[in-house]
């Protein structure tokens, strides 16, 4: 699976991630859904990258990939974004609009930071998963949806379950397969491989001759704790 080479690294932690992805994607059923996947780990550990890899390598690769950052949308608008709305459902609803679940029909819906999903939206999402239907705001009609779900969280969902901030039944629907994305500080010398890749990319982008990391630079990279991990466009 050559595409998994995007998950650069040789540490045991990243090997475990690749092995689990291989098991999940080795024989994907054509046209069918993969089991729901929950990606856990700190911010900046590559959960979005893995979500896109699973979509591209899975049986829904020819369908849409629709991503939503759950806390980035105001709670008052989230249900309309996810489930859609009919004309006149609220003051500014001048035209009917399908929601993101319908936009992801026969493809993949990526729910980023799903642990921060409001309780009301959790209940409607559970219905969509279990019954494979959605009902737009202002509508009395349910419409079929066929979606593969991938979710991600950097919060402790077990604590949220104990505190009753997250529905237990929804958790089990979303976490059929769980995958932990390790932080950089858990990946040892992988940081050097990543740094060298980004350095090579920067040299190419700016028309500079290839460069390598010196011993002092390597030592400082390895000694750093990498709070927030690493993001690179």
Positions of the model-derived regions?
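Short coil/loop residues immediately preceding or within conserved phosphate-binding loops
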Residues: 34, 96, 221
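Short gly/ser/thr-rich secondary-structure transition/capping motifs
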Residues: 88-95, 131-136, 159
């Amino acid at each position: 699976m050559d595409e998994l080479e995007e998950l650069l690294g040789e540490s045991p932690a990243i090997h475990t991630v690749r092995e689990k992805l291989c098991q999940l994607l080795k024989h994907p059923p054509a046209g069918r859904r993969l089991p729901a996947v929950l990606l856990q780990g700190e911010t900046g550990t590559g959960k979005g990258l893995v979500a896109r890899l699973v979509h591209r390598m899975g049986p829904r690769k020819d369908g849409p990939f629709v991503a939503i950052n759950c806390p980035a949308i105001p709670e008052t608008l989230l249900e309309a974004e996810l489930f859609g709305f009919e004309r006149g459902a609220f003051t500014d609803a001048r035209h009917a609009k399908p929601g993101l679940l319908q936009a992801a029909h026969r493809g993949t819906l990526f729910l980023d930071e799903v642990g921060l999903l409001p309780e009301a939206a959790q209940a409607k999402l559970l219905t969509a998963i279990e019954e494979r239907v959605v009902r737009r705001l202002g509508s009395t009609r349910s419409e079929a949806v066929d979606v593969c779900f991938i979710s991600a969280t950097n919060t402790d969902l077990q604590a949220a379950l104990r505190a009753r901030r997250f529905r237990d039944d929804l958790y089990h629907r979303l976490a059929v397969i769980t995958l932990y994305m390790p932080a950089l500080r858990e990946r040892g010398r992988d940081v050097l491989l990543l740094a060298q890749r980004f350095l090579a990319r920067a040299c190419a982008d700016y028309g500079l001759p290839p460069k390598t990391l010196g011993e002092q630079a390597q030592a400082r990279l390895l000694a750093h704790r990498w709070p927030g991990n690493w993001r690179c466009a």
